[in-house]
Amino acid sequence: MTYAVMDSPLGPLTLVATDAGELAGLYMAEHRHRPPMETFGDRDDSVLPAVAEQLTEYFDHGRTAFDVPLHFAGTPFQQQVWTALQDIPYGETTTYGDLARELGLVPGASRAVGLANGKNPISIIVPCHRVVGSTGSLTGYGGGLERKQALLDHERGDALF
């Protein structure tokens, strides 16, 4: 594994690559669930150029979807949730309960969906920021609620970046 660090309007982003060149992690500074940096291998800011380019386009309002190879390291349930997150359209939100229903889970599974959502290792590209509480309120986000709000505002065209 190797990693790169790129600047963004949200601060530095750490991009983690597998040896096969897949994106395995995208973490913001002070990310709540970021593994220790030493687990990412050596720093090489030339890895994952397509990811960095697409993120720059996203922040410049030129991209609404990503097309980069992803590597999910998690339980089968977490991977199911993370895959479903990619179907939430740009600029829209859904609730944990609605996401649980879309996955065909039993009533009350929204908490499990929320826990899996919170462990998403590939922020922004796997848009866990688009999931909100049942009342529309902002709830947990690994990069912090301020960044979650900034991403939602950005996608609605209300942001400064």
Residue ranges and their predicted role:
Residues 94-95, 108-113, 125:
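Short conserved catalytic/interaction loops centered on acidic-Pro-aromatic/His motifs
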Residues 1-107, 155-161:
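Basic nucleic-acid-binding alpha-helical/helix-turn surface characteristic of O6-alkylguanine DNA
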Residues 124-130:
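Short Lys/Arg-enriched helix C-cap and helix-to-coil transition segments
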Residues 134-161:
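…primarily DNA-binding HTH/wHTH and HhH modules…
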Residues 85, 110-119:
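Major-groove recognition helix of helix-turn-helix-like DNA-binding domains
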Residues 66-70, 113, 138-141:
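Short clusters of hydrophobic/aromatic residues that line enzyme substrate/ligand-binding pockets
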